């Protein structure tokens, strides 16, 4: 279960970073 949470956290972090990056590009 902990591994799944870690995977989800990584996905969320990546999505947040992508959103921030897109804002910078735009």
Swiss-Prot record:
<comment type="function">
    <text>Antimicrobial peptide. Active against the Gram-positive bacteria S.aureus FDA209P (MIC=35.5 ug/ml) and B.subtilis ATCC 6633 (MIC&gt;64 ug/ml), but not active against the Gram-negative bacterium E.coli or the fungus C.albicans.</text>
</comment>
<keyword id="KW-0929">Antimicrobial</keyword>
<keyword id="KW-0964">Secreted</keyword>
<keyword id="KW-0878">Amphibian defense peptide</keyword>
<dbReference type="GO" id="GO:0042742">
    <property type="term" value="P:defense response to bacterium"/>
</dbReference>
<protein>
    <recommendedName>
        <fullName>Guentherin</fullName>
    </recommendedName>
</protein>
<dbReference type="GO" id="GO:0005576">
    <property type="term" value="C:extracellular region"/>
</dbReference>
<keyword id="KW-0044">Antibiotic</keyword>
């Amino acid at each position: 279960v902990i591994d799944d949470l870690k995977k989800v956290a990584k996905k969320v972090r990546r999505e947040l970073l992508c959103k921030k990056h897109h804002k910078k590009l735009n």
